[in-house]
A protein has these predicted regions:
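Short glycine-rich or small-residue beta-strand-to-loop segments that form or flank ligand, phosphate
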Residues: 19-29, 102-108, 131-136, 201-205, ...
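Accessory alpha-helical/coil subdomains and C-terminal extensions
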Residues: 50-54, 66, 74, 124, ...
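C-terminal non-catalytic interaction/assembly regions of soluble proteins
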Residues: 267-391
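N-terminal phosphate-binding or glycine-rich loops at protein starts, especially the Walker A/P-loop
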Residues: 7-72
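Short glycine/serine/threonine-rich phosphate/pyrophosphate-binding segments
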Residues: 29-39, 60-61, 115-119, 138-146, ...
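Short, ordered loop/turn segments at secondary-structure junctions
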Residues: 25-28, 53-59, 108-109, 138-139, ...
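Glycine-rich oxoanion-binding loops at beta->alpha junctions
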Residues: 2-14, 65-131, 140-141, 165, ...
Length: 391
């Protein structure tokens, strides 16, 4: 087998009008590997030569750190050895459909915000003979794909598949979101039962740096008493109301997103976690930790991003893969397949998709069950989308 330094690059192979590049970027979520398998199967079935960037967007720039930068993806193992013998880096994907994590990405690549890096990547894309592009990730990867089209040019068909714990793009249910809620709500519910047993107040920090949808849905599903989202901030009057309500109840679970009051916390040394910062705020407002009723800030964990996807995510991955290749075959570009329900799926143009970090009005009654009129009014006036609040 050739060493990594001696593998052929796509540019050294015969040209192919259906050489599609898959780029995986952004934060990890259940379903990255599932989407890779689905795109490999569907692309191969339709006659595409499928490749993946081994480090996401970084692989197309001079800041790449691994070799080879691109790997050919196939379904089974039957042709793998022959391709390796020819010096082609190749990976068989068929049995990875339920794998956690992803083999083809690094941490989100912020260098792509620079136009010079996107231009460099477009030149590498063309040099390697790629003819179609599918980016996979969340809202940051989507923004990168949209921006990159300027350098790639209109002749390159571009698609995007939404994979994210946060589910922060409009008009789609992200692959990974449902699995994340199922796993996260299970942990939250366990803490609620512990709170009930020992008469405690738990402030549980959950994923959500900018988007609070994961924390919101986990909190609602676990029947948390209060959900605090990343874009929330509270005046003293609301904090006093929260502290008084929590002091009155025997036990409670408060779900707080990791991005809560991030800018304020960054100014403190050492920087407290979101749950600890909220605990300190509530303590100043009158909620005291004591031997008869503990008030405990539970730390944040990213392990939910590395759990295996649910089978429902597999179905969505294959449907989205089919839809994106349908679009390419029909001559469309700048499209995102969506799957909202069994009878609600299709394609959206990039122009019709946006990031969304606010609270939908329908969820307002579900944010708390302590009876907090000041909290409800404050959130409704400042943070509910479509009601004068921030998105």
């Amino acid at each position: 087998m050739p060493s990594p330094q001696n593998f052929l690059t796509p540019s050294q192979l015969a040209a192919n009008a259906k050489r599609v590049l898959l780029v995986f970027d952004g934060g990890d979520a259940p379903g990255y590997a599932t989407v890779a398998v689905a795109l490999t199967e569907e692309g191969t079935r339709r006659g595409y030569e499928v490749w993946a960037a081994t480090e996401g967007l970084r692989s197309l720039t001079s800041e790449r750190t691994s070799s080879p930068a691109f790997e050919r993806l196939i379904v089974g193992r039957s042709e793998r050895y022959a391709l390796l013998a020819e010096g082609i880096p190749v990976r068989s994907m068929g049995r990875r459909v339920l794998d956690a994590g992803s083999d083809f990405r690094s941490e989100r690549y912020r260098g792509f915000r620079e136009r010079a890096r996107r231009l460099e990547a477009a030149e590498e894309f063309s040099k390697q003979g790629f003819t179609q592009l599918i980016c996979v990730g969340g809202d940051g990867t989507f923004a990168a794909a949209k921006a990159w089209r300027e350098q790639l040019g209109p002749q390159v068909p571009v698609g995007f598949i939404n994979v994210s714990i946060d589910n922060d793009l409009t008009g789609d249910r992200a692959i990974g979101f449902s699995t994340g809620v199922e796993a996260g709500a299970g942990i939250a519910r366990g803490l609620l039962e512990d709170a009930y047993t020992h008469k405690r107040i738990y402030l549980m920090e959950m994923m959500g740096n900018r988007s609070g949808r994961h924390a919101l849905h986990c909190g609602v599903a676990a029947r948390a008493h209060l959900v605090v989202l990343p874009n929330f901030s509270f005046p003293d009057s609301v904090l006093a109301e929260l502290a008084a309500a929590l002091a009155r109840v025997d036990y409670a679970l408060v779900v707080v997103a990791e991005g809560y009051e991030l800018d304020r916390r960054k100014q403190l040394s050492p920087m407290p976690s979101a749950s600890e910062f909220l605990r300190q705020q509530l303590e100043l407002a009158g909620l005291r930790d004591g031997p008869l009723k503990r008030v405990i800030a539970e730390p944040f964990s990213r392990h939910l991003r590395g759990v295996r996807p649910a089978f429902a995510e597999v179905t969505a991955a294959y449907l989205k893969a089919s839809l994106v290749f349908d679009a390419f075959d029909a001559g469309r570009t700048a499209i995102m397949p969506f799957v909202l329900a069994a009878h609600d799926s299709g394609l959206r143009d990039f122009a019709d998709v946006r990031s969304h970090h606010g609270v939908e009005p329908a969820f307002m009654p579900l944010l708390e069950r302590l009876g907090l009129p000041l909290f409800r009014r404050h959130v409704s006036e400042h943070f509910v989308s479509g009601a004068g609040g921030r998105e």
